[in-house]
Each structure stands twice: as structure tokens, then as C-alpha cells.
Amino acid sequence: MPRYELALILKAMQRPETAAVLKRTVEALMERGAIVRNLENLGERALPYKISKHNHRHRRGGYFLVDLEGPPSIVSTMMDHLGRDIDIIRRAFIKYPVSKTEECSGIVPVNCEDKLIPKKK
């Protein structure tokens, strides 16, 4: 399964309400077959500009990152689901790049005589 990062901006709320929104979001991800690896709180701060969402203007928001693995079909369904959640201001899925690891071919022995500089006679 591909690995994704879900970036969320939640409206400014008290800690219990924020925890409820995150729990709801993580449960929705797991219902759709995702494996949640990590949830990171980046803190609450002022938004770079006023964002209007669900008939409200937001000036502050809580930033969160969810690290997950899931099927490719999860992106469109979760974007639709999160777009309808009134507590989420912005959401974005970022796909992790697939890193290819190169196998080590080992150390090639070098002839010491080839490294010696011939002396001038």
C-alpha cells in the first residue's frame, strides 16, 4: 500500500473538541482500510489569511499531520468526507515518494602496486 501524509487545518477549538475531531478522522481512515502510523500536532497559530469555510471566517487554526498507509482509493473518498466535516478548514493528501534502495556491491579489492607512483630513475 502506498504511504501518504494527510495535512489538516482544524478550526480553533478547545482541547476536548479537537481530540474528538481527530478521533473521528482517524476512525474514518481506519474504516476505509488505512493504517495510521503517526499523528503529529504542529500547534495552533494564526492562519496566513482569512479562510471562509462552512459560512464562517477563520483567523486561527490547529495544524496536524497524519502519517498513514492505505489503498489509492482512500484519497478521493477521504477528501470528500473531510470536505463535509464542519470542523476541518483545509485538508491535503501528500504521497510519499517511493525510495529505491541500491544494493551495495561490496568493496572491490585494489592492487597496491597500481597505487604506487613509479620513481624516476
UniProtKB/Swiss-Prot annotation:
Localization, UniProt: Mitochondrion
Spans through the membrane: none
Gene3D superfamilies per record: 3.30.70.60
Predominant location: mitochondrion
InterPro entries, per database record: Ribosomal_bS6 (IPR000529), Ribosomal_bS6_sf (IPR035980), Transl_elong_EF1B/ribsomal_bS6 (IPR014717)
Gene Ontology cellular-component terms listed: mitochondrial small ribosomal subunit
GO molecular function: small ribosomal subunit rRNA binding; structural constituent of ribosome
Pfam families in the record: Ribosomal_S6
Biological process (GO), any one: translation
Keywords from the named record: Mitochondrion, Ribonucleoprotein, Ribosomal protein
Self-association state and partner proteins as the record states: Component of the mitochondrial ribosome small subunit (28S) which comprises a 12S rRNA and about 30 distinct proteins.
Similarity remark: Belongs to the bacterial ribosomal protein bS6 family.
Protein name: Small ribosomal subunit protein bS6m
Organism field: Gallus gallus (Chicken)
Gene coding for it: MRPS6
